[in-house]
Amino acid sequence: MTKIGVFLLFLQSMKNKDKKLKSFEKSLEVMDMLREECPWNRAQTNESLRPMTLEEVYELSDAVLKKEEDNLKKELGDVFLHIMFYSRIAEEEGRFDIADVMDKLCEKMIYRHPHVFSDTKAADAEEVSTNWEMLKAKEKGGNRRILSGIPDSMPTVLKAYSMQDKARGVGFDWEKKQDVWDKVKEELGEYEAELEALDKASSEDEAAAARSRAEEELGDFMFATINAARLYGLDPDTALNRACDKFRRRFTYLEEKTIRQGRDLHDMTLEQMDEIWDEAKARGL
C-alpha cells in the first residue's frame, strides 16, 4: 500500500473514532438530563435497577441466540444504559464516575493481556485463559480463592459450568473425558435409589428426609451431566435453551391445533395429545 493510502486509512480511522466519541458523549448528556428532569429516573437506586438489569441481560442473550441483528443493537444499548445509570448514581454520591469505570476496565484488560501489551507469549486461547486466571489471582496478592469470583446469584447451570471450568484451570479435571460417564451413571443410580426410598416412605418425616436426599442426588447428577457437556465442548445452557425452545414450539402446535379443532386440552387423553405432539415432531418443530 502506498503512503497516501496508509494516510487515508488513518484519516478514516480517526473519523470513525471521533464519531464513536461523539455518540458516547451524547449518551452521557441524555443520562444526565434523565437524572435531573425525569421523576422516575431520579427515583432509581442500585437496588431498584438490579432486577431490571438482569432482565436486560437476558433479553440481550435472547437476541444473541436468535441472531436478531437489529434487536441485538437495541439490547446492547439497553445494557449500556444501565452501566451509565449505575455510574451516574455513584457520581452523584461522590464515589466514582463513568471515566473511572472505563479507566479500570482498560487497566484490567491491559494487565491481563500481556501477550498483547508486553513481551509475554501465548500459543493459543487455552494458554491465554490459564494466564488470565493466574493474573486475576495475583491481583489479590495470591489470596483469592479459585471459586470466589463466581456470583452466588448466577444462574445455576452457568454457575456449575463456571466452577468446573475454573477448577480445570488449576488441573482439577478428568484426565480422560470418557471417564466422566462412570460418574454420570453413578450419580444417576444414587438419584434413582433415593427416589425409590421416597416412594417407600411410610411417614411424613421419612418422606421429607428421602425427598431432601433425592434432591441432593439430583443436584449431583445434574452437576455431573454439565461436567460431561463441558468436557465434550458443549454449552449446557445453550443446549437446555434449545430443548426449551423445542418444547415450546411443539406444545404451541399442540395447543393451537386443539383450539382449531374446537377441543380443550383439559378434556383430551394423553394418547390424543401425544398423537398431535408426534405430528409436530414429524413436521420438524
Indicate where each model-derived feature is located.
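Flexible "arm" and connector segments at domain edges
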Residues: 5, 10-75, 81-218, 223-285
